[in-house]
Amino acid sequence: MYKLLNRTDFINMENIREDLEYYIKKYNFDGIELIKFNESDNTSVKEYIKGYHMRFFPSWFELYTGNISALYEELKDKKYFKSLCGGEESKEELIDYYKKELEIAKELEVEYVVFHACNSKVTESLTYNFKYSDKEILDGVISLINDVFDNEKYNFKLLFENLWWPGLKLLNKEEVEYLFSKIKYKNIGLMLDTGHMINSNYHLKSSKEAVEYIKRNIDNLGEYKNYIYGMHLNYSLSGGYVRKSIEENRDKKIDIEDLMKRIYIHINSIDYHDPFEDEGIVDIIKSLPIKYLVYELIAKSDEELEDKILRQDRVLKKFKIF
């Protein structure tokens, strides 16, 4: 099992090797899972990059299906399309973006790539009144991934990650079975995000309840739990915040300009990526064929990140996971 740390390419390229070597050596990581937001060339540190997280455009579905009028109806202004949808005019922009990402992943010689198999309109993140069903989004994911991979052959695994919005939630085997049966690329598996799974039930009130909930869902996957090759290990318990957001916004006219100014604060309040410190997580890790255990933590400073790494290490080292 690899112990990995998630990192973005926001770091200055002159300092990226120093940054990666610091965390890898000090905390005994085997490497990183990279998510890219800029055009920097990361091949100089590719020996440290085990996985590549494909960019997530949360509202991609209507761009992909050509429902541009629905995007204007919600977002009012085209200036938001690219960051939320992956393009401004047509699905070809989104497909081309992801094709380029696969070429980057190939150049970096990563072992796996991760894709968020879900969609949410930005206002739905406040109200939880979702326009599209899980099945509709999964059908979109299948079509998009088949377009992007386009019968190309790569050496890396494609891991589908669960979220709490419409799409893949990993709550039952039927959704996984359906997804896997339609994807043409066959070197596939699952990336279980523990925080995302907790987020899918905003009635959970404690880490103990969260652990039991994750265990039940894994049991519900049946034989498909054997495809969980990766785990994004983190913890969020934000049900109280979510319930309040739903109550305050479901019957309210939402100002999109105001929402876009605070959307990242809102999402981080739901999915805040703390360490998973309940020792019950250890049995879950041991029950799965995980090869890539990723500390996926969010921090506002290096000091906060190191504190979170230490807190996560404390739990896993106690039970000799590493």
Put a short name on every predicted segment.
Residues 87-189:
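Active-site acidic/histidine proton-transfer and metal-coordination neighborhood
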Residues 1-2, 22, 95, 99-100, ...:
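Histidine-acidic metal/acid-base catalytic patches
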Residues 23-27, 32-34, 126-138, 144-145, ...:
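Residues lining hydrophobic/aromatic ligand-binding pockets adjacent to catalytic sites
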Residues 17-24, 40-43, 102, 145-149, ...:
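Short amphipathic alpha-helical segments and helix-helix/interface helices
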Residues 61-72, 131-132, 247-253:
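Aromatic- and acidic-residue-enriched segments that line the glycan-binding/catalytic groove
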Residues 1-100, 318-322:
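N-terminal pre-domain/capping segments
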Residues 1-9, 30-34, 48-54, 113-115, ...:
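Hydrophobic faces of well-ordered beta-strands that scaffold small-molecule active sites
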Residues 10-16, 29-45, 57-62, 92, ...:
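Acidic-and-aromatic substrate-binding clefts and catalytic sites of carbohydrate-active enzymes
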